Amino acid sequence: MQSWSETAVPSVPGQGPPLRLFDTADRQVRPVTPGRTATMYVCGITPYDATHLGHAATYLTFDLVNRIWRDAGHDVHYVQNVTDVDDPLFERANRDGEDWVVLGMRETALFREDMEALRVLPPRDYIGAVESIGEVIEMVEKFVASGAAYVVDDPEFPDVYFRANATEQFGYESGYDRETMDKFFAERGGDPDRPGKEDPLDALVWRAVRPGEPSWPSPFGPGRPGWHIECSAIALNRIGSGFDVQGGGSDLIFPHHEYSAAHAESATGDRRFARHYVHTGMIGLDGEKMSKSRGNLVFVSKLRGEGVDPAAIRLGLLSGHYRQDRPWTEQLLADAHTRLQLWKDAAALESAPSATDTIARLRQHLADDLDTPKALDALDGWARRALDHGGSDTNAPSEFAAAVDALLGVRLRRP
């Protein structure tokens, strides 16, 4: 699947401290220690609707990780999937009387446009679930052969399920107790009451063909992949086990990331799928989480269509800490526009105070678990000093603009 266009990233003199991120599995902020090539997998969209601000906040978070690694001199192998075969896509297509393939392609194209407008650096591998069917089948075959998975006793729909106890470390990623797992499994796409399952928490890895659904041939009969195994297969086949960061929204902690890890660990025998599990908070509107099921969405494409500067959208979402649940408001967007203009005015000066210390603070705050509120405050301070008191450093405005562009993805000057 085609990704979106790369945007140029300026080079900024100097180097920041090593990146530290909160790891969901270890429940602490700790260093991320990639090799020469940093590796990251972020779960992508199910393309049955446009990109909302909750999506955007997640992808902006991991765009910062990408930029920080690049600033530190790493090559970055970033992988993102598209869940282009799944129940919500089929349900929306049926509701609207549209071909599910056409719907998925259209919404994926709109997502790419939104990401490009927000200046999110594209993944090296942008992979649809449909493209990874063969890889999934190989994994399911391995599970069945090893006893990690079984076929339910249902002649009509012989689905294949992964045993939740197939790995002894199951549950380490989320840290949830059984009661919480049962609750979220039922709420987030699981099927605990499916007849024939050995354990309500056993996860679907191959869904036998149903009337009106697409299917692919397999040794277990025609069907399609379960949700979690798609990400396991795509990640293992592009960046392997033990990659640096797996990312997504906090609603993916369980079941999706727990099972993606368990599937991969069962397939490889490794103890840990990813070295860091990093999750973003939810974006709310009117006191509730922004979600398709609630219908309280603010779409990036709609804001762009209304003439909102994508850079202001970006700054608005970065104004809060990535791990916090936080609201989106009109005032937040207005403040982001004000901040953007402040920075642009300062970057347009012919001379200003030295920006060296400010750039160092920007790097320091971002390296400290992506502390964007402090990073943005530091930039505000320099911009106000430059506009109010001036300075004699003729390189400072361009250095400031380059750092904001490279590390935050916000362009202050015309190229």
From Swiss-Prot:
Name of the protein in question: L-cysteine:1D-myo-inositol 2-amino-2-deoxy-alpha-D-glucopyranoside ligase
Source organism (scientific name): Rhodococcus jostii (strain RHA1)
Reaction(s) catalysed by this chain's protein: 1D-myo-inositol 2-amino-2-deoxy-alpha-D-glucopyranoside + L-cysteine + ATP = 1D-myo-inositol 2-(L-cysteinylamino)-2-deoxy-alpha-D-glucopyranoside + AMP + diphosphate + H(+)
SUPFAM superfamilies: Nucleotidylyl transferase
Family indicated by similarity: Belongs to the class-I aminoacyl-tRNA synthetase family. MshC subfamily.
EC number: 6.3.1.13
HAMAP family the record matches: MshC
Binding site for L-cysteinyl-5'-AMP: C43, G44, I45, T46, T58, N81, V82, T83, W227, G249, S250, D251, I283
Gene3D superfamilies linked: Anticodon-binding domain of a subclass of class I aminoacyl-tRNA synthetases (1.20.120.640), HUPs (3.40.50.620)
Annotated residues for binding of Zn(2+): C43, C231, H256
